[in-house]
């Protein structure tokens, strides 16, 4: 356990642990490969999910920990969908590979509504934890609604990415901006830098996938 908690360096007076650096590196590699339309992103994603599970377990962040099996399931679904498209979904450039597609506007409206409702309901429950419910057992979340909105957006972005929807990168951009806000408010230094790298990759991938979409339109 102590091996993973080795302090590699300090940034802005905050220690950066080995587990933090590894998680950031594998996370960035996963989205980088996904943005380049590489199926290898799923294999790296499995390692990333395992690292997050271990990190959240160590830090007693059980709300985040229980999401990792869900992320694992989405990753498995994505690997299958990208490799086993229906004939009408097959890429014109690569046989046997899922093409990039887009959500319709009605579908976007439904997803946005679901994200807002789920984030509000989950945020309300989290706002009660440590303040009115289980006081002394759970630390109060200073930004419950923003935190829950980010979590719901992450699961939404992962699902859309697994289905190879261009819109996933829009969701990821919202996630990156929200995460950047959360990390800065928490006084962190290393994670905002990582979030900026995610943001740059998200913008690049948005245009990369749009070009792929146009080729198959």
Language model: regions and residue ranges:
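Hydrophobic/aromatic-rich structural module bridging two neighboring secondary-structure elements via a short loop
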Residues: 45-100
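Polytopic alpha-helical membrane-helix bundles and their juxtamembrane interface segments
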Residues: 1-37, 73, 82-89, 97-217
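Membrane-interface helix-loop junction between the first two transmembrane segments
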Residues: 33-47
């Amino acid at each position: 356990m102590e091996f993973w908690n080795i302090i590699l360096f300090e940034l802005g007076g905050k220690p950066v642990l080995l587990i933090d650096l590894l998680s950031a590196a594998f996370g960035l590699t996963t989205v980088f490969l996904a943005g380049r339309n590489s199926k290898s992103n799923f294999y790296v994603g499995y390692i990333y999910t395992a690292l997050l599970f271990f990190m959240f377990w160590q830090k007693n962040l059980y709300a985040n920990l229980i999401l990792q099996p869900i992320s694992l399931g989405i990753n498995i679904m994505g690997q299958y969908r990208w490799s086993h498209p229906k004939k009408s979904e097959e890429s014109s450039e690569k046989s046997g590979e899922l093409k990039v597609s887009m959500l319709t506007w009605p579908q976007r409206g439904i997803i946005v509504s679901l994200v807002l409702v789920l984030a509000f309901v989950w945020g309300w429950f989290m706002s009660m934890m440590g303040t009115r419910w289980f006081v002394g057992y759970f630390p109060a979340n200073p930004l419950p609604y923003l935190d829950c909105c980010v979590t719901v957006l992450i699961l939404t972005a992962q699902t859309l990415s697994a289905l190879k929807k261009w819109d996933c990168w829009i969701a990821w951009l919202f996630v990156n901006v929200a995460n950047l806000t959360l990390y800065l408010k928490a006084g962190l230094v290393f994670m905002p830098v990582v979030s900026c790298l995610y943001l740059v990759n998200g913008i690049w991938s948005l245009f990369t996938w749009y070009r792929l979409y146009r080729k198959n339109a």
